[in-house]
Curated annotation (Swiss-Prot):
Name assigned to this protein: Transcriptional activator ptaB
Keyword flag Transcription regulation: yes
Location within or outside the cell: Nucleus
UniProt feature, compositional bias: Low complexity: 38-56, 286-300, 307-341, 655-671
Gene name of this polypeptide: ptaB
Quaternary structure (record): Interacts with somA.
Functional note: Transcriptional regulator that forms a complex with somA to control biofilm formation.
UniProt-listed InterPro entries: LIM-bd/SEUSS
Compositional bias of kind Pro residues: 1-12, 272-285
Amino acid sequence: MPQHPGLPPGHPMAPGQHPNAHPGAGMVQAVHPGVSAPGGPQVTQGGPMMGMPPGAGTTGPGGPVQAHALSHLGPAQAHLFQQPQFAQTFANNPQLLQQHQHQQQILRQRMMFQQQQAAQQQQHAGLPVSLPNGTQGLNAAQLAAMQANSGMRPVNLQMHLQQMPHGPQNIQQQQQQLFAMQQAQQAQQAHQAQQAQQAQQAQQAAAAAAAAAAQPGQHTPQQRHAAHPQNMHDAQSVTPQPQPPPHQGSSTPQSNPPQPPSSQPQQQPGAAPQPHPTPNPPPQQLPQAQQPGQQPHQQPQQPPQQQPQQQQSQQGQPQGQQQQMTPQEAQMKAQQTQNQAAMMMQQRMGMKGTSILALLTFAEHLSNFTSRGEAQDLLYWQAFVDKFYSPVGVLRQGVYNPQAGSKQFEISTPALARYYLTQFTSGIRQIQMLVEGARERDSPNGGRIVESRRTSFIYWFTNESQLFTNGTLIAHFDHNNKIEMLDIVVMNHTEYLPRSQLQPLELSEQKQSPKVSKNLGKRAQQKQAQQAAPSLPESMVTANGVPTAVMSFLEVAETISHMQMLFQFSQQNPQFSPPEALRNLVNTLQSQNPNPGFMPSPMNPAMQQGQNLRGPQMNGPNQFASPAMAHLGLPPQGSPHLSAHPSPAQSHLAGPPGMVQQGQMQPNVGQATSASASPQVTNKRRRASTVKVENDDTGGPEVNGTATQGAAKVKASPRVGGKRQKGTA
């Protein structure tokens, strides 16, 4: 069927239809499922055939790929570019033509990126990763277009990684490696983009200078370009360019031989115009060229007027790219900050538990000690302190006394080695440290704090006895996991003896039967008494729960810790002797803090009053009385040593000041326990209560004033009779 010659090229019956060209405007476009148009859906997740590239089934950049590249455009856009009347519109509107060319260039770059991504997916088993060797061909414009389109970002790896036969740890490691590689690639691409922008600006400046030097004879390429707009647009929309630089123009039509931009001949002033074989000018210079409707006398003035516009239009694109790179750089910086925070968090998570492990290692070394001699033991403990304690570390060792309670002694690092040695030379054979329920937390100074609510120390002594101490422990570690302060609070202690030492004592305490003791003679009983009775072994610890030598060391160490200021002052001033250093230090402290109330001088009455609050000096107006009346400072009820709660009946016995009670002038030994003492009057004595017997001569007692005649003598009571017998006898 012959085709109608008047139909537009987009119609199916139009002449010169290319077999791979786009269908007409009224036909439905058969777009590949993996190909996306600017207004169509975007493929962001691979389907069952994710390993295949989006353009599967197409050939290379030589033949049918041209039609495939044309299929990236929507139906309206393809039909628009094939209509001749729109070419005239572009020629009349240079800005619209430049915008259209820029969009067309971005579409070609998108197609190339999809092809490269498909090749990378085939190389990496369908995973759309961005490796350094896969994106080396991208230039600045392609990078900007790729990053501007959010739909062209890499596919989410979560579903694919879940299907891979790797453990969670391997997946996390792979994600971290891929993330690091992507960051490095982004940094490299940003650097390349900056270099490309600089080169582009230099080339555009050179092109602007060449355009300024051109003469009016340049209207011939524009006329030829206006005469053949359809062929130029077809060639621009069909021919793909793998790496098109921004200054490079479109390809030459088929009727003209292709020539590089550097080989374009520059026409001299006054030269005749060439009507036919002239290479196409760059596309960025076309909008600024002379329009067909202008007069010839305006042509010499046109290039100087259009040169600033050309430079502005050429500089517009690099400025837009620089503005577009600014948010990207901010995003990269934000990602770097997040990565640093994540790395610090991972380091913190990795360090969590290391302080507890260091404390358990400390306890293990303390428990595994075996004595090899005092000299070698001291070297061992010095190495022990250097390994686990900070140079400024402190041990706060606690002791417990049932009467006084808990107390702590502070030992600095230089004395710690001698402290541990003193423990093992004072009768302790082994020390076992048990830490229960240890918890670790961060310290404000950047270290770690390990706290245990229940910590036990078990001491084995040379006499087979054991001592158990229970308390709490708080250990402060620095960033090197060394102890800055080890705080041990002892709540109680218990001493245990082995059963083998208690069995002989139990046998000796068994009582013998009376029959056996009667049968034995007195000599045998004396021999058994003379035999040494078994007794408990002597305790090797004091009431504080530590050996005597250790307690003495703690007391001396506490004194030395309070004298550290004096030691430092003496070391800073070696010209002073110890007494002179002490005297100068006291004078320095007095000058810095001029308050004599805090100086412990015997001539200071305020300190004496503070030390003896119950003295006579603190008893009001009597403090200036005569020394002979010092006893008047006592309470009016008498000495507090005699009665803390005196009887109210004794209040009337208190005389005026200057008089002494009678009972206090005489010895009152047995006054409180005497049977004849009155409960109300302290100094009154009573006669002994005895039965009065009269008329002893008559031989009988009186009954109601009448003596009984001939009656038998009544026997007195045992109590009274005993006394009477002694008196009568």
